[in-house]
Amino acid sequence: MSQERLLSVLRAPHISEKATNNAEKSNTVVLKVALDANKAEIAAAVAQLFEVKVDSVRTVVVKGKTKRRGNKMGRRSDWKKAYVTLAEGQNLDFVDSAE
């Protein structure tokens, strides 16, 4: 995989209560990823960029909500979320690295 594609696959960490619980209980990190990224690309990107061993990847496409502002109707964009399970002994903590 090219370095350019590697950097474009991962968008941002997804921080939520569910994501925090998954990180503590099952060593799973939740990431926002490119809509056209597949599981193999996501696993390779996480392994190479963060130097960790990936155990499995699960993905879900989150549909954008319909929003209304006054009389105008609009729709937010769809986005893809990836649950990346790391191997035993591996750790990837976004909160501690930001401090």
Curated annotation (Swiss-Prot):
It holds the Pfam family Ribosomal_L23. InterPro entries: Nucleotide-bd_a/b_plait_sf, Ribosomal_uL23-like, Ribosomal_uL23/eL15/eS24_sf, Ribosomal_uL23_CS. The keyword rRNA-binding applies. GO terms for molecular function: rRNA binding; structural constituent of ribosome. GO terms for cellular component: ribonucleoprotein complex; ribosome. The keyword Ribonucleoprotein applies. GO terms for biological process: translation. Keywords: Ribonucleoprotein, Ribosomal protein, RNA-binding, rRNA-binding. One of the early assembly proteins it binds 23S rRNA. One of the proteins that surrounds the polypeptide exit tunnel on the outside of the ribosome. Forms the main docking site for trigger factor binding to the ribosome. NCBIfam families: PRK05738.1-1 (NF004358), PRK05738.1-3 (NF004359), PRK05738.2-4 (NF004363). Part of the 50S ribosomal subunit. Contacts protein L29, and trigger factor when it is bound to the ribosome. Belongs to the universal ribosomal protein uL23 family. This is Large ribosomal subunit protein uL23.
